[in-house]
């Protein structure tokens, strides 16, 4: 009747005894968007923070063992949601949408979280590895939307006559050559979050100021100082509070994996990156010098000397069309699986 199965109902209601239901019991029925048993459709529409919240609510209803939390809040007070899948001691962190017009990375990590939970619950493999083994060996933390205010700006959540939209447009006027709002990468205050971490921040400032990015705007403004923004502060604090063995930061575009920061060479970092590249078809490269400072990946490697990666998905001009989603996800499912498997051994 509801397009569901007894197995799905049992998974959504742990501890339920179908032969002994007290009167007044409330049962979660995960009605199907599983058309013919297929996965939940993640990559067909533009994302907003509100839509992300609904998808997370659905994941939690279908798989109560998935943990939900928040690592902090955005400038406008939106929660920076975090999902955790797994129960082992070792941990990894996958984040997406540091950059607003790279929002297609949000459903990529969200779908992986859902698929891992689904394969664990019902049996199966993900990225070529047994999902139950991954689940039992460690925890994967997902922060699917680091920059919700910026994503909402790009995807039309704010009315053109709203105060938020008008303020962003005023900042964009500092850079008339950049399309608005499509060219917006920054948070709603006009700071590029992936240039706001304390790893060569002064060098990043020198480079970007020389390129003309001296004021808040759609992209490439490094901020007044490192960790000046609530979103970057939240990510840094959350990282310090945990003991991540590996991190992946998702961006677009280029079909490339960046694995190094300066002369830091964390143990097995290149080898893991090579495996990710071989499995995905992406290139494994050094970060271009003009973009080689003050990113989350750079800071993580500098502080912990552990493998950290920036993965640039897809090809074309940001924001990438949703028509690329299936191809992007197919390439990155093995990347995320390899990151976990290599960190949990």
PLM features per residue range, with description:
Residues 5-37:
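Extracellular LysM carbohydrate-binding repeats and other cell-envelope/extracellular binding modules
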Residues 12, 30-32, 71-73, 85, ...:
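Active-site-proximal beta-strand/loop segments in catalytic clefts of secreted hydrolases
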Residues 64-67, 78-80, 88-91, 136-141, ...:
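Loop/turn elements at helix/coil->beta-strand transitions in domains of secreted/extracellular proteins
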Residues 77-80, 126-129, 291-298:
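Alpha-helical scaffolding within the catalytic cores
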Residues 182, 197-345:
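Metallocarboxypeptidase
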């Amino acid at each position: 009747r509801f397009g569901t199965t007894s197995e799905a109902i049992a998974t959504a209601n742990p501890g339920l005894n179908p032969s002994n239901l007290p009167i007044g019991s409330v049962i979660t029925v995960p009605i199907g968007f599983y058309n013919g048993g297929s996965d939940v459709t993640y990559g067909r529409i533009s994302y907003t923070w509100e839509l992300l919240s609904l998808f997370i609510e659905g994941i939690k209803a279908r798989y109560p063992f998935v943990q939900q939390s928040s690592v902090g809040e955005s400038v406008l007070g939106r929660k920076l949601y975090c999902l955790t899948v797994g129960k082992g001691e070792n941990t990894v962190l996958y984040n997406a949408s540091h950059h607003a017009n790279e929002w297609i990375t949000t459903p990529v990590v969200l779908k992986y979280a859902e698929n891992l939970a689904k394969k664990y619950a019902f049996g199966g493999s993900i990225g070529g590895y047994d999902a139950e083994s991954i689940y039992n060996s460690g925890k994967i933390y997902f922060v699917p939307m680091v920059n919700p205010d910026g994503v909402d700006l790009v995807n039309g959540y704010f009315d053109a006559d709203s105060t938020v939209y008008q303020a962003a447009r005023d900042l964009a006027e500092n850079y008339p050559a950049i399309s608005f709002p499509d060219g917006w990468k920054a948070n709603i205050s006009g700071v590029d979050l992936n240039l706001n971490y304390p790893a060569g921040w002064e060098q990043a400032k020198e480079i970007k100021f020389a390129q003309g990015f001296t004021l808040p705007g759609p992209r490439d403004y490094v901020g007044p100082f490192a960790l000046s923004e609530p979103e970057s502060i939240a990510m840094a604090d959350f990282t310090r509070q945990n003991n991540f063995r590996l991190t992946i930061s998702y961006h677009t575009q280029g079909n490339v994996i960046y694995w190094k920061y300066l002369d830091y060479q964390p143990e097995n970092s290149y080898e893991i990156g090579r495996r990710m590249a071989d499995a995905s078809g992406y290139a494994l490269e050094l970060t271009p010098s003009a973009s080689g400072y003050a990113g989350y990946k750079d800071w993580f490697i500098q502080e912990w000397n552990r493998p950290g990666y920036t993965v640039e998905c897809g090809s074309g001009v940001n924001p990438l069309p949703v028509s690329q989603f299936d191809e992007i996800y197919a390439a990155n499912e093995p990347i995320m699986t390899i990151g976990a498997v290599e960190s949990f051994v």
